[in-house]
């Protein structure tokens, strides 16, 4: 995304093509790579996988390269399919699967907020290309409701991560909260996380 912003559109396109080439059959990627080699085969994280949609849509908005969008569509489609396979009946999406593909059994507020934005971008891609993926918006709506109204579905197996600023601001950044709700959320912990003239901790 930085390459796209910086005007290095060919380099950005090649980076996305590299990702597409490494995508696994189920639509996911391993947590990290070094070149063509897998650097971490212990897990595959849902918010990382979903974010391909945000990156592809971002590049298209900058480049207006419809051929790029069409070429990347199968990659995005498979990635979102993998991510939504991890959504529970309550709406949250599991943060990862282990090396054997078993869901880890918990969800992250920040990770799910990122997925919320990625589902919006993925659906924008689908609409632009004339593909029907209305169920992605349904899944996004369920995820948003879980983030806003079901805090018990997150941080079930570890200490709450609400002590970190990203759990506070990311649901606003990703559009889970908007308008007055977003302002109220930011105001509620502003003094806890924001250092005057320095930034957010």
For each feature predicted by the language model, list its residue ranges.
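Aromatic-rich carbohydrate-recognition surfaces in CAZymes
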Residues: 1-88, 112, 116
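A near-ubiquitous, low-amplitude feature marking generic local secondary-structure context
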Residues: 2, 35, 66, 98, ...
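Extended ligand-binding clefts on enzyme/binding-domain cores
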Residues: 71-74, 78-80, 84-95, 102-117, ...
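Acidic side chains
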Residues: 47-48, 65, 94, 98, ...
């Amino acid at each position: 995304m930085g390459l796209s912003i910086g005007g290095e559109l060919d380099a950005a396109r090649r980076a996305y093509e590299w990702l597409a080439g490494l995508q696994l059959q189920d639509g996911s990627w391993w947590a990290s790579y070094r070149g063509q080699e897998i650097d971490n085969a212990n897990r595959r994280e849902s918010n990382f996988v979903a974010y391909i949609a945000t990156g592809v849509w971002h590049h298209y908005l900058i480049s207006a390269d419809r051929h790029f969008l069409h070429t990347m569509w199968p990659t995005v489609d498979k990635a979102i399919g993998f991510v939504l396979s991890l959504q529970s009946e309550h709406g949250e999406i599991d943060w990862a699967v282990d090396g054997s593909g078993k869901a880890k059994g918990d969800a992250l507020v920040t990770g799910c907020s990122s997925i919320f934005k990625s589902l919006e971008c993925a659906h924008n891609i689908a609409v632009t290309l004339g593909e029907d993926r209305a169920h992605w918006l349904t899944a996004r709506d369920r995820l948003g409701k879980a983030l806003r109204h079901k805090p018990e579905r997150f941080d079930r197996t570890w200490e709450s991560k609400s002590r970190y600023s990203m759990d506070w601001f990311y649901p606003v950044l990703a559009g889970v909260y908007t308008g007055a709700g977003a302002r109220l959320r930011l105001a509620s912990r502003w003094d806890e996380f924001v250092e005057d003239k320095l930034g957010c901790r």
